Amino acid sequence: MTFPNINPIIFSVGPLAVSWYSLSYVVGILFGWFYASKIIEKFPTQITKKNLEEFVTYAIIGIIVGGRLGYILLYNPYKYFSNPIEILKTYEGGMSFHGGAIGVIIAAYIFCKRHKLNFLSLTDIIAPVVPIGLFFGRIANFINGELYGRVTNSSIGVIFPDSDLNLRHPSQLYEAFFEGLVLFCILAYAVFKRNTIKKQGLNSGLFLMFYSLFRIIIEIFREPDVQIGFIFDSLTMGQILSMPLLLLGIYLIIKTECRSITK
């Protein structure tokens, strides 16, 4: 299948341009905010709706600054340091999930310190929400024809306009499905059917573990960034960055369950 060359800019009014990438962030944040509010309503904790409203600004800054700096430092430092003006062109893409995650974690830590809130209580509310943003972000990647997969002979292969005209795995859609929809359903089941909110740290651990597993597996089908290629002959940067998160997720789950047993 040949992918249509879709303009990354949806529309523009004078100097203001609205891109698919920007829209995915806005929609993801709005839907995420709404969903987190519903979780707080059903499962009251130390975190209130007012806390959530105040944290949204922190989260946006963490996502944008962390995501952009993460991509620049981890994936393409030479390009941006040699032409710093490119750093500001976030509408063209170039955001790192791992960088954004670190940005939000730092933002959450600062917010909790200032408001005397428990850090894991907040991240347990955030964790079930993140797959919403991941879903819309990967759909935007697909529309932009970027971050595509490796060459394939499969019937589901797509010829992307900016690639080498070979059929390639639509790995953006794989990620949207597993890291977005499937992970959302797993965490929704955990929250609403298993009441995991009462086990501090469990939602955070489940998110980290399942996201990392899905990312490590899907990276097998995703084309490595051309400026980095493979690391240690077979691993991608995404896989390497996901491994510590996987271990942290498993640690949080075990710690939470052990704490529940001893109570």
Swiss-Prot record:
Its main location: membrane. Signal peptide: none annotated. GO terms for biological process: lipoprotein biosynthetic process. Pathway: Protein modification; lipoprotein biosynthesis (diacylglyceryl transfer). A 1,2-diacyl-sn-glycero-3-phospho-(1'-sn-glycerol) binds at R138. Keywords: Cell inner membrane, Cell membrane, Membrane, Transferase, Transmembrane, Transmembrane helix. Its EC number is 2.5.1.145. InterPro entries: Lgt. One of its GO terms (cellular component) is plasma membrane. It is found in: Cell inner membrane. The chain crosses the membrane at residues 16-36, 55-75, 92-112, 117-137, 172-192, 201-221, 234-254. It is an enzyme of class 2 (transferase). GO terms for molecular function: phosphatidylglycerol-prolipoprotein diacylglyceryl transferase activity. It is a multi-pass membrane protein. PANTHER family: PHOSPHATIDYLGLYCEROL--PROLIPOPROTEIN DIACYLGLYCERYL TRANSFERASE, PROLIPOPROTEIN DIACYLGLYCERYL TRANSFERASE. NCBIfam families: lgt. Belongs to the Lgt family. HAMAP family: Lgt (MF_01147). Catalyzes the transfer of the diacylglyceryl group from phosphatidylglycerol to the sulfhydryl group of the N-terminal cysteine of a prolipoprotein, the first step in the formation of mature lipoproteins. This is Phosphatidylglycerol--prolipoprotein diacylglyceryl transferase.
